[in-house]
Amino acid sequence: MEEILRNARKERTGKVVSNKMNKSITVAVERKVKHAKYGKFIHKTTKLMAHDENQECGIGDTVRVMETRPLSKLKRWRLVEVIEKAK
């Protein structure tokens, strides 16, 4: 029998920009994209809503999130770990 790999899901690392919701956080994930014409690398930011079951995150924390089933209208990610707490 084949085993279903749970680790085949996407993982992203980013900073928490909002934790005002109940058991939810907003994570800003930054990536570099090369400009098509000029070749300069541009920083693009994607904001993800993630599920924080224990409400352990604060604004400015660096966190790792993993893709999961839809939990609400906008939440499709869940908190895996807090990499670094904000100072």
Curated annotation (Swiss-Prot):
Q: InterPro entries from the entry?
A: NA-bd_OB-fold, Ribosomal_uS17, Ribosomal_uS17_bact/chlr, Ribosomal_uS17_CS
| GO CC terms of this entry | cytosolic small ribosomal subunit
One GO term under biological process is:
translation
CDD domains in the record, alphabetically? Ribosomal_uS17
What residue stretch is flagged as signal peptide? none
Molecular functions per Gene Ontology: rRNA binding; structural constituent of ribosome
One Pfam family recorded for the sequence: Ribosomal_S17
Q: Could you say which protein family the record assigns here?
A: Belongs to the universal ribosomal protein uS17 family.
Instruction: Write out the function statement from the record.
Output: One of the primary rRNA binding proteins, it binds specifically to the 5'-end of 16S ribosomal RNA.
What protein am I looking at? Small ribosomal subunit protein uS17
Protein species of origin: Cytophaga hutchinsonii (strain ATCC 33406 / DSM 1761 / CIP 103989 / NBRC 15051 / NCIMB 9469 / D465)
List the taxonomic lineage.
Bacteria, Pseudomonadati, Bacteroidota, Cytophagia, Cytophagales
